Amino acid sequence: MASSLLTTPSQTLAPNPAAARARRSSPAAAQVSFSSPLLPGRRALRCARPVAIEKEVPEKEAPTTFLREDGSGAGSGSVRERFEGMIRRVQGEICAALEEADGSGKRFVEDVWSRPGGVCVHSRVLQDGNVFEKAGVNVSAVIGVCPRSAYRAAKGAAKNGAADGHKAGPVPFFSAGISSVLHPKNPFAPTLHFNYRYFETDAPKDVPGAPRSWWFGGGTDLTPSYLIEEDVKHFHSVQKQTCDKFDPSFYPRFKKWCDDYFYIKHRNERRGLGGIFFDDLNDYDQDMLLNFATECAGSVIPAYIPIIERRKDTPFNEEQKAWQQVRRGRYVEFNLVYDRGTTFGLKTGGRIESILVSLPLTARWEYDHKPEEGSEEWKLLDACINPKEWL
């Protein structure tokens, strides 16, 4: 999961020499401040200058908005403002639904931190509940600059800048997202992962008028330890219904993308039983894709909570629990070896608690473990090796 905004190479924060000089001469210039907003009652994350990744700073509470007070930020009605509002709302709705399903009376622990260069993350985590061993729901936003070569969509700006022989410099960007992994205790209740994010650039300051770039990414996928077709079909039907509201080609396209992405090469199997996944999506109207991402995020509760309610109290034995731990081991392997967000965060000094919040509390590795052919465990493994059409 890796808190989706410090996660992909296209989002690397580049050093800014001017900002570095400003910090040396005026330390306060690099600070994040929650200052008097333009809109009454709103506190905005204000970033004096985009800077390189720096040490995180704990915050007492989450700001009302992560956005700057400028023409495309707080109060502008921009896509970035609407997307940020959506992920903040969805975080609250999902945490409330999970607390109700857990029934332990426990509440999500909240953790808010920022970086002076324009990063703010609001993590919410529930551990050792009645139903959930570990559940994390994070929202985050980054305001910074990308190196000119760091992302493919900025190539248009380089062409514009080449007309006068001037090479475009670093590109200002904004990114925001919600990311979550939910690990239940019961082996018959599946793990769920979802992640929805938005990325956009501004024109480089040395190439005014260059085209802005933007894209959406994300997905929702299910990772059971036991194959219960009723549950898997319900989950996939919700994904298809959501996709079909926008384009009938979305579900088959994004289902295959999901099966391909969550592939554990060294095991020759998928992490789970799929769902939908997409990235760098910008080939449709921007408002349409914003609505699509909003619908996808909103479909998490109806796709998952009914399954949890059916399975959270299913009796199980020690062998079934051990199999769940083996499958959790596969989850850990994928996240630490292949997941782009996790590996990028580990390599670039990201906040470790946010990066590893996706991992389960417990997992298991048995030497040369092979389930008996025809067993319930084997059926799950076969479906992970050979992706199926569930609808």
UniProtKB/Swiss-Prot annotation:
InterPro entries per UniProt: Coprogen_oxidase_aer (IPR001260), Coprogen_oxidase_aer_sf (IPR036406), Coprogen_oxidase_CS (IPR018375)
Chief place of localization: plastid
Residue numbers spanned by region Important for dimerization: 125-134, 331-366
Site (Important for dimerization): H266
Catalytic activity: coproporphyrinogen III + O2 + 2 H(+) = protoporphyrinogen IX + 2 CO2 + 2 H2O
List of catalytic residues: H193 (proton donor)
Domain of life per record: Eukaryota
Amino acids binding substrate: S179, N195, Y196, R197, G349, G350, R351, I352, E353, S354
EC id: 1.3.3.3
Molecular function via GO: coproporphyrinogen oxidase activity; protein homodimerization activity
Pfam families named in the record: Coprogen_oxidas
Chain intervals with Polar residues compositional bias: 1-13
Biological process terms in GO annotation: chlorophyll biosynthetic process; protoporphyrinogen IX biosynthetic process
One GO CC term on file: chloroplast stroma
Stretches for region Disordered: 1-34
Protein's cellular compartments: Plastid, Chloroplast
Associated pathway: Porphyrin-containing compound metabolism; protoporphyrin-IX biosynthesis; protoporphyrinogen-IX from coproporphyrinogen-III (O2 route): step 1/1
Biased composition (Low complexity): 14-30
Keywords, alphabetical: Chlorophyll biosynthesis, Chloroplast, Heme biosynthesis, Oxidoreductase, Plastid, Porphyrin biosynthesis, Transit peptide
Function text: Involved in the heme and chlorophyll biosynthesis. Catalyzes the aerobic oxidative decarboxylation of propionate groups of rings A and B of coproporphyrinogen-III to yield the vinyl groups in protoporphyrinogen-IX.
Subunit structure: Homodimer.
Family membership: Belongs to the aerobic coproporphyrinogen-III oxidase family.
Name of this protein: Oxygen-dependent coproporphyrinogen-III oxidase, chloroplastic
Gene name per UniProt: CPX
